[in-house]
């Protein structure tokens, strides 16, 4: 897990989500033991394991969906430490029964907000290979959010360096 301020990128992503949400469902796969050891004693973090994690993120969303017990949920990546309370609040204020996909200058981002019904329909879509494809087949709204952070995930060493430079 990559360092971020006084913790890790995942620590920051979870902390930011918990500023708005009352719990986080954390789906582990690769490095599951490390993740479990780090977060298992936090009552507002529910850890689920995806044995098929190597098959892609969509399988993790399917595993996490089984732990959703609220009317709506956000879906985001654990490598997006710059999402904050304001971003979650803006998207939440627009909630409806559709999938709300935030965009920055037309580029889709995160967190995506879904009703539980919409989530269950999306993960049940036949012949889709990823969540975005599943969401776009169902009822959805693309919502413009004037905040580049919704598109800034840290996937490469260059992304990590750029993110660190933004926070110096």
What are these regions (language model features)?
Residues 30, 100-117:
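Short beta-strand-to-loop element that shapes/binds the nucleotide-sugar donor at the catalytic cleft/hinge
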Residues 120, 124-168:
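Conserved alpha/beta core of the MobA/IspD/sugar-nucleotide pyrophosphorylase nucleotidyltransferase superfamily
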Residues 42-55:
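Conserved donor nucleotide-binding strand/loop of the catalytic core
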